[in-house]
Amino acid sequence: TLHRPSNVDEREVLDPIIRFLLDEVSKDLSIIWPIHPRTQKQLKTFGLWEELLAHPQMILLHPIGYHEMLRLNMDAQVMLTDSGGLQEECCVLGTPCLTLRWNTERPITLEENGGASILVGNNISRIREEYQNTLQKDRKPVRPELWDGATAKRCLEAILSY
C-alpha cells in the first residue's frame, strides 16, 4: 500500500516505484494492491493508472476491510507499504515488510529491534536491494519480545501481586 504524500504526490517519486513494481517485482510475484483513493487519483493524474490496470501481474483492489487486509498480509511473501499500522501487523504475522518511509513512529517494528520491518524510504536502489535480500530469507515470525499474546495474563498477574 502507498498513500503518504511523500510517496504519491510527486511523479518523480511515484513513477520509479511503479517502474520497480512492474519491471522487477512482477517477475517474481503477483502484486495485490489495495489502492487508497488519493493514490488512485495521483496515478491517474500522472498517466500511470491504465498501465497498472493492463499489467497481467497487477491486481488492483478498491480499499478493503481490516479482515481482508489481514488475510492478504498473512499470505504475502513481502509487504511494501508506507502504513504504520501494516508495519505492526507484519510483525505479528511474520510477514517481511519494506517500509517506504525514512522514519517511523513504530520503531519496535524494525528488524534491528526484533521486528519484521526495514525502512527503505523511496530510494529505488535501497528498495531493490532489500527486496532481493528479503526474497532470499526464510520466512518466520519475527516479533518483539512482549508481542507474544500474553499481555492480559501479565497485566492480571501484576494486578494480583500488587
Regions found by a protein language model. Give the residues of each.
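Nucleotide-activated sugar donor-binding and catalytic core shared by glycosyltransferases
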Residues: 1-31, 39-162
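Conserved C-terminal portion of the radical SAM core fold
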Residues: 36
